[in-house]
Amino acid sequence: WQLPYIKAISQHHQTNIDLIVREKTQAQNILKDLKHINQIFYNDFRKGIFYWLDVFKLKKIFDTEKYDYVYILDKVNKPAIAAKLSGIQNIIAPGIKNQKKWITSKNYLNEDDWNLNYSEQSQKFLKINSIKLNDKFPSLEIDTERLKQGNDDLLVKGKKIAFGVD
């Protein structure tokens, strides 16, 4: 659901971008053919003692990759804290609740925006940061030749039915 907003940020900066997501998203496999994504890192978003381990894992990624901008499309604090610890000058996020302590952007959502759904929050977030959104609908690019390799189970003749839930 965040794909249109990720693409808009890529187009805004005229560069391919890196993503950091939970491993359970399987993004390295599912999103590998999207041309506006450079590379995908996995990081957990856990609580308790693991919270700080995850922050320092993010910091290591930020230090290694030397990003100029970190965009966060959710209310989470970990990437903002890690970016701040890494000295990143442009930390841009919705700024909901405590997150605004860690971001550098002065344009963030207000507390009433917390009641919007995630897509509406992201759309408003882009708008207040002057990022043009060309298409609100997510789309995937799939290299079908690559998909055929090692996926014989998907190449079944006849009807196939898929059911997806979140």
Language-model-detected regions and their locations in the chain:
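Catalytic machinery of carbohydrate-active enzymes
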Residues: 1-166
